[in-house]
């Protein structure tokens, strides 16, 4: 057993503790309190300093296999132009190059206080890296097939791929089937995924182009499909928002992780809340690609469960979800700092179904993060969201 001390301990699911202490044993938290509490266990003390100890962060939406695209994709031409450039560029590197950059990204995550990821992959080429890492990972094997005739074959390929990697999985590494987005996956494939209890994740209501295509069937996304040789495929636009379209297909459920949700209205928010969908906000990526971000205060007020993610290095500078927490605080100063940090910890753990992460409490895993400080901060949450704090991983290996 060992006791960690810090200027502040932020359990997240309980009030913050000035001069807090956390006792850990066997990789688990066994006690949380203050020095001198009568029930404090006897154990050697490791004094971290004047800074802030908190649960390790959860990056609930990233794309590790796109890490080789850092700085490669122009962002100035709008969302569809960015997608088109990404599609054209992502294959211009060897598999070893993809793996090398993914490995570097995983190391950076580990070093800076992230303990779990919701990672979207089309290939699973880096699965072995995650197995060897210190991260808990839920990997979403993402399916794309706009042609309804390919739905069955696409799902068969995915199930074969899942069966092939079962021996590489474990308690800290899981693979679930996901759909890319409502405007890139055919209704036939979405319904087949529903038949398997999914999809487990989706990009949802990210861009205005997506919304326009589903309402009217035209616009920049329809033109993109035409350039891709898929403009001839029959599609009757549902005439509703992306959120309500997925509701009509009965694929919204409490285990669904929906990234972005920028283009949503009040009724969409009520739908998401009613179905218990976990929405992962990616404020830096949305800012960079769209010039706007999801209305986090309105989503929170509607009762939508919220988490934070970074998206990929093709659209942001780092995979540090603390940077997204800082951006969300800058964009929406009316949000309580405690709530933003909850999104980056407990919210992400809940979205990914990682019940033993996201908080400092007895029984939880002692995979923690520490932000050093020269003096004990007056307001620990605001200190973490100042843009000056940097995290390091502490606690259990």
Please place each PLM-identified region on the residue numbering.
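Active-site metal-binding motif and surrounding structural segment of the metallo-beta-lactamase
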Residues: 36-54, 197
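Active-site gating loops and adjacent loop-to-helix segments of metal-dependent hydrolytic enzymes
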Residues: 68-100, 134, 138-144, 208-255, ...
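C-terminal cap of metal-dependent C-N hydrolases
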Residues: 365-397
